[in-house]
Amino acid sequence: AGVGLQDRALFQERVDYTLTNQSEGDFHDQQLTNTSFAGAVGRGADFSGANLHGAIFTQGAFAEADFHGADLSDSLMDRADFTRTDLRDALLIGVIASGSSFAGADVEGADFSDALLDRDDQRRLCQVAEGVNPSTGVATRDSLNC
């Protein structure tokens, strides 16, 4: 019963990036499921192709970061700065992103199905939304309920 040694070892290896500066950091193609970047600064960081399922980005600053093709599903992204980020082909299914800024973000092919976004953000994203997510086959405009 309880947590196995292997599970404990995996948990101990998980890195917590809360309140750290990861600007220009290289996280591409990494397995970062459930990792916390809460309050972190990740301006210009490379998260392309990373598995960030269930990650926490609350109150973080990720302007101009690259999330191209990343899995951000079920992530907490509330009150965070995603200004001018590359979210092309990203999975944002079920994210909670209330109070966040996506101004100037490239969302071509991103899947926002069941995402919680501020109404103003949703309207702005709909103005530039295009493409179809290559993994889910869902059109970005449809996922945003445009």
Spans of features found by a protein language model:
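Tandem repeat scaffolds
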Residues: 2-145
